[in-house]
């Protein structure tokens, strides 16, 4: 039986096509991936991301605990701020990437990937020490993401809280949005400005409908996982299971900015990651653009001079750039800009070249 979010009941009304995504029955699209993608890049789109996991970490030793588990320096977080981090195994492979919200000293909220909820909880639970309480509240929380250049304008209609005061990677708790109490965070997974909004499960439908109603004039569309994927891909934001996995380290994936090997605390995987930061890695994640006609897809093999040098992690026809592009994890010696490589598509090796990432960056 597939898991469903509290918004499942209203999907049909908005014409959703659902798919099985990591054990969840979720909308891949409402109108079309292209239309939804375009809406987020130019106006705004609303996503149901209630499948994501939320854990509360509380107690006097919670900072010391998180410092041991996280690659980033959690001690740098101040109240009301958000931090991107990763958890790694001893060998540097990735357990998950996640967001850490600091509510107060000794009180944090972790937001993890849906497919990793059980694994992450067990991983954290297995390393608990001292005065730390770890609670999985994923079942109680719904999460909506309103993303795009007009996101603030739309959401502001529903609240008296000044949303412009919530800066990037900051949040405010207990905001009243059209009668619904929510945590509002200026974060997202699209490369655009926008908010991720956390509320109680039972308030999800009311919140969803009031945001779409408020955004009618601006052309806000309900959006599915298809557009979420093409948007995050263009912005070169990693997806666990593709750019990151137990076999791929954050350094290989180009996420060294979130790995603080110089922080005071020791963390799991530190030795390997420190070495990789200092000495480099044998393979690296790069952008590729097809020269020949073809679309690179996840898992396709990449070749150079007749030898296999890696594989595509994500690829698609970019709706914004109108080009066939991909992210590929390949041997470091082939990662210089404009290096010609080949992608094996349906048994044929087709020409591509290494290009700069991110593929898309919004004008500030």
From Swiss-Prot:
GO-annotated molecular function: aminomethyltransferase activity; transaminase activity
One annotated Gene Ontology cellular component of this protein: glycine cleavage complex
EC number assigned by the record: 2.1.2.10
Annotated GO biological process: glycine decarboxylation via glycine cleavage system
SUPFAM superfamilies per the UniProt record, alphabetical: Aminomethyltransferase beta-barrel domain (SSF101790), Folate-binding domain (SSF103025)
Signal peptide bounds: none
InterPro entries xref list: GCS_T, GCS_T_bac, GCST_C, GCV_T_N, GcvT/YgfZ/DmdA, GcvT/YgfZ_C, TrmE/GcvT_dom1
Keywords from the named record: Aminotransferase, Transferase
Catalytic reaction list: N(6)-[(R)-S(8)-aminomethyldihydrolipoyl]-L-lysyl-[protein] + (6S)-5,6,7,8-tetrahydrofolate = N(6)-[(R)-dihydrolipoyl]-L-lysyl-[protein] + (6R)-5,10-methylene-5,6,7,8-tetrahydrofolate + NH4(+)
HAMAP family: GcvT (MF_00259)
Family according to the record: Belongs to the GcvT family.
Subunit description: The glycine cleavage system is composed of four proteins: P, T, L and H.
Job description of the protein: The glycine cleavage system catalyzes the degradation of glycine.
Protein name: Aminomethyltransferase
Organism phylogeny: Bacteria, Bacillati, Bacillota, Bacilli, Bacillales
């Amino acid at each position: 039986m597939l898991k469903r979010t509290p918004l499942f009941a209203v999907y049909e009304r908005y014409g959703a096509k659902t798919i099985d995504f990591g054990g969840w029955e979720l909308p891949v699209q409402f109108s079309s991936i292209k239309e939804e993608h375009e809406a987020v890049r130019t106006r705004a789109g609303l996503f149901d991301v209630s499948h994501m996991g939320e854990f509360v970490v509380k107690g006097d030793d919670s900072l010391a605990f998180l410092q041991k588990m996280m690659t980033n320096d959690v001690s740098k977080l101040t109240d009301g701020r958000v931090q991107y981090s990763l958890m790694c195994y001893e060998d540097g492979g990735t357990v998950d990437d996640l967001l850490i919200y600091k509510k107060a000293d000794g009180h944090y909220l972790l937001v993890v990937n849906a497919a990793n909820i059980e694994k992450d909880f067990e991983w954290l639970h297995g390393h608990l020490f001292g005065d730390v309480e770890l609670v999985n509240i994923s079942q109680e929380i719904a999460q909506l993401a309103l993303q795009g250049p007009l996101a603030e304008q739309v959401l502001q209609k529903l609240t008296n809280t000044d949303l412009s005061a919530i800066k990037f990677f900051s949040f405010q708790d207990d905001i009243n949005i059209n009668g619904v109490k929510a945590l509002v965070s200026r974060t997202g997974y699209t490369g655009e400005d926008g908010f991720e909004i956390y509320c109680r499960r039972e308030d999800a439908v009311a919140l969803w409908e009031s945001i779409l109603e408020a955004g009618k004039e601006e052309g806000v569309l309900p959006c599915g996982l298809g557009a979420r994927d093409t948007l995050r891909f263009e912005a070169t934001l990693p997806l666990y299971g593709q750019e990151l996995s137990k076999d791929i380290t954050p350094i290989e994936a180009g996420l060294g900015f979130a790995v603080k090997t110089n922080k005071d605390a020791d963390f799991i995987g530190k030795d390997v990651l420190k070495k990789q930061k200092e000495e480099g890695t044998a393979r690296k994640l790069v952008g590729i653009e097809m020269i020949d006609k073809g679309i690179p897809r996840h898992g396709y093999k990449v070749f150079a001079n007749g030898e296999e040098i890696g594989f595509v992690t994500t690829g698609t026809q970019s709706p914004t750039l109108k080009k066939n592009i991909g992210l590929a994890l390949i041997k470091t010696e082939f990662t210089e800009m404009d290096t010609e490589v080949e992608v094996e598509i349906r048994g044929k090796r087709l020409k591509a070249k290494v290009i700069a990432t991110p593929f898309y960056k919004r004008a500030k």
